[in-house]
Amino acid sequence: MTESFQKLEKIGEGTYGVVYKARERNTNRVVALKKIRLENENEGIPATTIREILLLKNLKHSTIVELSDVIYNNNKMYLVFEYVELDLRRYLDRMSDEGRLVEEGFVRKMSQQLLTAMEYCHSRNIFHRDLKPQNILVDPKENIKLADFGLGRAAGIPLRTYTTEVVTLWYRPPELLLGCKYYDASVDVWSAACIMAEVVLMRPFFPGDSEIDQLFRIFKVLGTPNNSRWSNVENFPNYKVEFPVWDPVDLKTIFRGDPDFVDLISKMLEYDPKMRMTAKNGLSHKYFEGMPLIME
């Protein structure tokens, strides 16, 4: 590894391993070098993981961080990504420190780019499963790019990050919190809506500190679900008949800006994944009227 890349600094410990800012020696290009943590490094990497990760090299879109190379030696796997300095978490923290709110134009542009990246991957049957502000990168022109798409299925999502930090629950959809084992692209749509809400509110929408706290925070806003609202939910492994019953809150009282934005995220936060708006349908929502589609 050291022959090809000079590690400049450690920039993070993500869900899947350590990330370094590095320089490619023969081109001088600055890249993000992600060392994938493997459950048992002695056994080597399963062929399925290698296949899945190689598929990610085919994802080429302006809204997705490009995976330019996969390096595998001594049972270690490194992924070489284009380097983008800022992520949405740090972008929002910086705005907050400066006492500034995010402009409406940024919210619309970011939401459209986020849904475009999702639609591009979902149409190829690749899901993210771990969308959060930390893996949405913001370039100097305030365009966003999604990182870590597809790694969830390729590497498996651990319960803890590389250190012992627990993977955040704030963007996790209710079907996963309720123990549903089968899920699809709609999990990403829920996470995206939570992120869009956070950008507008300048604070996490559902900042739970445990799975039950996470569920109850969702229920307090959207109402406690039951079979009449979400078919079969009462049979999910973690559903309890003793759940407190909350009525839904009108989202317009939380988001006082553009009513089209409220309509869009309410459709993305539909409890029943089958009824939840898809990324593709989201892109043709009235909220994006007049905005040109983003081509590859």
Swiss-Prot record:
Coiled coil stretches, renumbered:
none
Q: Which UniProt keywords apply?
A: ATP-binding, Cell cycle, Cell division, Kinase, Mitosis, Nucleotide-binding, Nucleus, Serine/threonine-protein kinase, Transferase
Q: What is its main location?
A: nucleus
Task: Kindly list the GO CC terms recorded for this protein.
Answer: cyclin-dependent protein kinase holoenzyme complex; cytoplasm; nucleus
Give the reaction(s) catalysed.
L-seryl-[protein] + ATP = O-phospho-L-seryl-[protein] + ADP + H(+); L-threonyl-[protein] + ATP = O-phospho-L-threonyl-[protein] + ADP + H(+)
Q: What is its EC number?
A: 2.7.11.22
Protein kinase domain span: 5-288
Q: Name one GO biological process term.
A: cell division
InterPro entries in the record: CDK, Kinase-like_dom_sf, Prot_kinase_dom, Protein_kinase_ATP_BS, Ser/Thr_kinase_AS
Q: GO terms for molecular function, please?
A: ATP binding; cyclin binding; cyclin-dependent protein serine/threonine kinase activity; protein serine kinase activity
Binding-site residues for ATP, renumbered to this chain: 11-19, 34
- Which CDD domains does the annotation name? STKc_CDK_like
Compartments in which it is found: Nucleus
Please name the catalytic residues of this protein.
130 (proton acceptor)
Family statement drawn from the similarity comment of this UniProt entry: Belongs to the protein kinase superfamily. CMGC Ser/Thr protein kinase family. CDC2/CDKX subfamily.
What the protein does comes down to:
Cyclin-dependent kinase that acts as a master regulator of the mitotic and meiotic cell cycles.
Q: What is this protein called?
A: Cyclin-dependent kinase 1
Q: What is the lineage of its organism?
A: Eukaryota, Fungi, Fungi incertae sedis, Microsporidia, Unikaryonidae
Instruction: List the gene name.
Output: CDC28
